[in-house]
Amino acid sequence: MDMTRIPKQKLVIIAGSPCVGKTTVAEKLFTAYENSAFFDGDWAWRVNPFSINDPRLRNGNKTMSYALSTYLNSCFDYVFFSSVVAAYKETREAILNDVTANEYSVLGFTLTCSEDTLLKRHKKRGDKNECSFFWLHLAPCEGDYVINTDNKSVQQVVDEIKCIVDEY
């Protein structure tokens, strides 16, 4: 096997705080590429009431791993995965360790913005929960490309990520 060959399949992870724009950006990226798939981590654990302290929350990781495995094993060239929990190194590693596909590359992106921008986006979304800056101040996972979304349109952020994905 040629060890210098970069796998054709790319798993693109979009992490960041709630309301930073992960889903919106990932949806746009997904439609910009042929033979692509998109999975939003929010779909993996949609429960009421939701609590970050719920010990069952990590069960959603298995759903994420399964969905990503299914897309990669179905030979999609690009798989886009957006999730707030992918901001945590240990959680991301646990999800990726359970992916059953082989020979794919992983590109990680962390979207960020100012507290003021996050608050404006939170209000615009109409979220009734209190806006938290906790995730905004987490250090990005090692190796992630950090994209500051302040004063950028969704398309500008998509184009910035697309340049990196296309060069990889």
Region annotations inferred by a language model:
Residues 23:
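Walker A/P-loop
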Residues 17:
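P-loop (Walker A) phosphate-binding loop of NTP-binding proteins
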Residues 20:
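ATP-binding Walker
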Residues 26-69:
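Conserved substrate/cofactor phosphate-moiety recognition/catalytic segment
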Residues 59-102:
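Glycine-rich phosphate-binding loop used to anchor ATP phosphates in small-molecule kinases
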Residues 14:
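Hydrophobic anchor at the beta1->P-loop junction of P-loop NTPases
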Residues 102-122:
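Conserved phosphate-donor/acceptor-positioning beta-strand/loop module used by diverse small-molecule
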Residues 123-162, 168:
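Small-molecule kinase domains that catalyze NTP-dependent phosphoryl transfer to phosphate-bearing small molecules
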